[in-house]
């Protein structure tokens, strides 16, 4: 049981039921060696075989064992009998006018009678980087009032393999794997943000295990300084994340008064602002070079006054911090509006003059509901025929 009140491997709603023939994706080296032992690979070969598999899976992006030409034919046949390299299935892809891509990914439900479980993953290309926004849960339990994902019930946690699988799907779709022509070439996916569907720190073990695989420099190899974990404030797991994962930290703050944050981010009722700020001060990976990002969505007439800006500066005193100001991205049925641009600039200027970096995030992918706070698995509501139509669309891409 997580200290925040939600089990780490089993949610209050549903559980993950592994397939009869499991995927190797998401296993640590030790777990992969155990899997090889279970299918009869001799002890003296396991370390070498794990290294071979790791390279083919996470450097070359192999989708089948047949591609692994440095592995013996007999070994490939044995692997094919017992395990897979399956990643999430792309159900649909949308491409924004600004180049942002959103993938709807299908996951095993664990029950043939259930609708397939689906999450969304977003790729945001920029001139100097390519950022992938990754989900940690199917749905969300936090019910943040301004967030579209919060209107979808929590279904279950993702596994480490499903988290790593999102990065692999993105590299598949973008043709972003190393090959003979580009063994060390620039990659399109350079940064990872755990800012998709779900609260990462309510799925701590899977998020930790997945991100450590993503950061492994003998595989996918994305530096921990290019990976950001965003939390709404699961205080007991914040310091633990710094100790066991060591990536960059972002806090979904959005308010500087408990009474307002209780409404915007209901988790605040359990872990109020003072406790959250202390956890940030204690975060072991924070420094002037590795500042904590505080995300602050700009809501017209709600949290965007200069008094709010003054309180924010006072609140962050003594924390290595930067502030991301996020223009609110509307979604169907919301009661909030985005702050006027003039007010956003005044807020940003006040925070900047107080000594904090305060960039205003450029909205990306709004036209395909891929921007911050807009993600939701709309197919949770679709009929089987409609889901089949979406899958057919994806296969023709």
Curated annotation (Swiss-Prot):
Its cofactor is [4Fe-4S] cluster. Specifically methylates position 2 of adenine 2503 in 23S rRNA and position 2 of adenine 37 in tRNAs. m2A2503 modification seems to play a crucial role in the proofreading step occurring at the peptidyl transferase center and thus would serve to optimize ribosomal fidelity. SMART domains: Elp3 (SM00729). It is an enzyme of class 2 (transferase). GO terms for biological process: rRNA base methylation; tRNA methylation. Signal peptide: none annotated. The keyword Iron applies. Binds 1 [4Fe-4S] cluster. The cluster is coordinated with 3 cysteines and an exchangeable S-adenosyl-L-methionine. Disulfide bonds join 133-372. Reaction proceeds by a ping-pong mechanism involving intermediate methylation of a conserved cysteine residue. Its EC number is 2.1.1.192. This is Dual-specificity RNA methyltransferase RlmN. It catalyses: adenosine(2503) in 23S rRNA + 2 reduced [2Fe-2S]-[ferredoxin] + 2 S-adenosyl-L-methionine = 2-methyladenosine(2503) in 23S rRNA + 5'-deoxyadenosine + L-methionine + 2 oxidized [2Fe-2S]-[ferredoxin] + S-adenosyl-L-homocysteine; adenosine(37) in tRNA + 2 reduced [2Fe-2S]-[ferredoxin] + 2 S-adenosyl-L-methionine = 2-methyladenosine(37) in tRNA + 5'-deoxyadenosine + L-methionine + 2 oxidized [2Fe-2S]-[ferredoxin] + S-adenosyl-L-homocysteine. One of its GO terms (molecular function) is rRNA binding. One of its GO terms (cellular component) is cytoplasm. HAMAP family: RNA_methyltr_RlmN. The lineage of its organism: Bacteria, Pseudomonadati, Pseudomonadota, Alphaproteobacteria, Hyphomicrobiales. It comes from Nitrobacter winogradskyi (strain ATCC 25391 / DSM 10237 / CIP 104748 / NCIMB 11846 / Nb-255). It is found in: Cytoplasm. The active site is at 120 (proton acceptor), 372 (s-methylcysteine intermediate). Residues 126-369 form the Radical SAM core domain. PROSITE patterns: RADICAL_SAM.
């Amino acid at each position: 049981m997580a200290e925040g009140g939600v089990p780490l491997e089993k949610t209050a709603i549903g559980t993950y039921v592994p397939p009869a023939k499991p995927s190797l994706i998401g296993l640590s080296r030790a777990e992969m060696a155990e899997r090889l032992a279970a299918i009869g690979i001799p002890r003296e070969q396991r370390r070498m075989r794990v290294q071979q598999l790791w390279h083919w899976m996470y450097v070359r992006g192999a989708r089948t064992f047949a591609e692994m030409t440095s592995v013996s034919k007999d070994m490939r046949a044995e692997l094919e009998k017992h395990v897979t390299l399956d990643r999430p299935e792309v159900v649909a892809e949308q491409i924004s006018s600004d180049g942002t891509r959103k993938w709807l990914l299908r996951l095993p439900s664990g029950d043939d009678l259930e609708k397939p479980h689906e999450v969304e993953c977003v790729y945001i290309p920029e001139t100097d980087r390519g950022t992938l926004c990754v989900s940690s849960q199917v749905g969300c339990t936090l019910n943040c009032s301004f967030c579209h994902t919060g209107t979808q019930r929590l279904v279950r946690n993702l596994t480490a393999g499903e988290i790593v699988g999102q990065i692999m799907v993105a590299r598949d779709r973008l043709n972003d794997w190393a090959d003979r022509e580009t063994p060390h070439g620039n990659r399109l996916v350079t940064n990872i943000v755990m800012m998709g569907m779900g609260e990462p720190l309510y799925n701590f073990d899977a998020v930790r295990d997945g991100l450590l695989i993503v950061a492994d420099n003998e595989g996918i190899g994305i530096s921990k300084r290019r990976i950001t974990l965003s939390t709404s404030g699961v205080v007991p797991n914040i310091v633990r994340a710094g100790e066991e994962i060591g990536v960059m930290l972002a806090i979904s703050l959005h308010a500087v008064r408990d009474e307002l944050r209780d409404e915007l981010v209901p988790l605040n009722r359990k872990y109020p602002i003072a406790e959250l700020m202390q956890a940030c001060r204690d975060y072991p990976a924070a420094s002037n070079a590795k500042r904590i990002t505080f995300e602050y969505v700009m809501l017209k007439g709600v949290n965007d006054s200069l008094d709010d800006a003054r309180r924010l500066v006072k609140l962050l005193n003594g924390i290595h911090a930067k502030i991301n100001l996020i223009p609110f991205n509307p979604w169907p049925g919301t009661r909030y509006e985005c702050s006027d641009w003039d007010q956003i600039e005044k807020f940003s200027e006040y925070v900047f003059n107080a000594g904090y970096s305060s960039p205003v995030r450029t909205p990306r992918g709004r036209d395909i509901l891929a921007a911050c706070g807009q993600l939701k698995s709309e197919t949770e509501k679709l009929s089987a025929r409609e889901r089949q139509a979406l899958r057919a669309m994806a296969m023709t891409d």
